[in-house]
Each structure stands twice: as structure tokens, then as C-alpha cells.
């Protein structure tokens, strides 16, 4: 298993309960596919560097996980499909 950092931006118009459900759903996608979530950070609502789909703000989430490639690929696939996630990125952390 390798260490990854995942950052995704949730559409700002999503209600708080739906937002929590979305975060739990994507955390479940990772854990159900064998990943271990080390740390979760909610950066909250922040201004975007540039407009995405005519939106100027987004709710940022950052996850640090130990995972295999299958869990990361499934997360990536579902994040691309979901309309409430504006952008996401998965970065593999370097071995020290």
C-alpha cells in the first residue's frame, strides 16, 4: 500500500447535510475498496483561483490515505461522474 493525498472541491450550493453525506460516501468508497484513511481535513469554503462552471467558491476537502491502486481508481472514476464535485486531484506521496 502507498500513501496518497486526495483533494477535492465540492460545489458551494450543496446543503450541509448533503455535503456531509457526500464526504461520507467518498470516504466509504475508499475504505470499502481496502484503503485506510489516515487524516481528513475540511478547509471549508474558499475562493477558487479561477471560475469553474461559473462558480467562484468551493468547499475544499483533503484526505491522507494508505491505499492500493484499485481504491484510488474507483474514487477517481466516481469523482469524475459526480456533479457536486467540481475538481479533484490524487497525489502519490514520495517514499522517504
Curated annotation (Swiss-Prot):
Alphabetized SUPFAM superfamilies for the sequence: Ribosomal protein S6
Cellular component GO terms, alphabetical: cytoplasm; ribonucleoprotein complex; ribosome
Domain of life of the native organism: Bacteria
Entry keyword Protease: no
GO MF annotations, alphabetized: small ribosomal subunit rRNA binding; structural constituent of ribosome
InterPro entries, per database record: Ribosomal_bS6, Ribosomal_bS6_CS, Ribosomal_bS6_sf, Ribosomal_S6_plastid/chlpt, Transl_elong_EF1B/ribsomal_bS6
Keywords assigned by UniProt, alphabetized: Ribonucleoprotein, Ribosomal protein, RNA-binding, rRNA-binding
GO biological process: translation
CDD domains in alphabetical order: bS6
Function recorded in the entry: Binds together with bS18 to 16S ribosomal RNA.
NCBIfam families: S6
Family: Belongs to the bacterial ribosomal protein bS6 family.
Protein's UniProt name: Small ribosomal subunit protein bS6
Species name: Bacillus cereus (strain G9842)
Gene: rpsF
Amino acid at each position: 500500500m502507498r500513501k496518497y493525498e486526495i483533494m477535492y472541491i465540492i460545489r458551494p450550493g450543496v446543503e450541509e447535510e448533503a455535503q456531509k453525506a457526500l464526504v461520507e460516501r467518498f470516504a466509504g468508497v475508499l475504505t470499502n475498496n481496502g484503503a485506510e484513511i489516515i487524516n481528513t481535513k475540511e478547509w471549508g469554503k474558499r475562493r477558487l483561483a479561477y471560475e469553474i462552471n461559473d462558480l467562484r467558491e468551493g468547499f475544499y476537502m483533503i484526505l491522507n490515505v494508505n491505499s492500493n491502486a484499485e481504491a484510488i481508481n474507483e474514487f477517481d472514476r466516481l469523482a469524475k461522474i459526480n456533479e457536486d464535485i467540481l475538481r479533484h486531484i490524487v497525489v502519490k506521496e514520495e517514499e522517504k
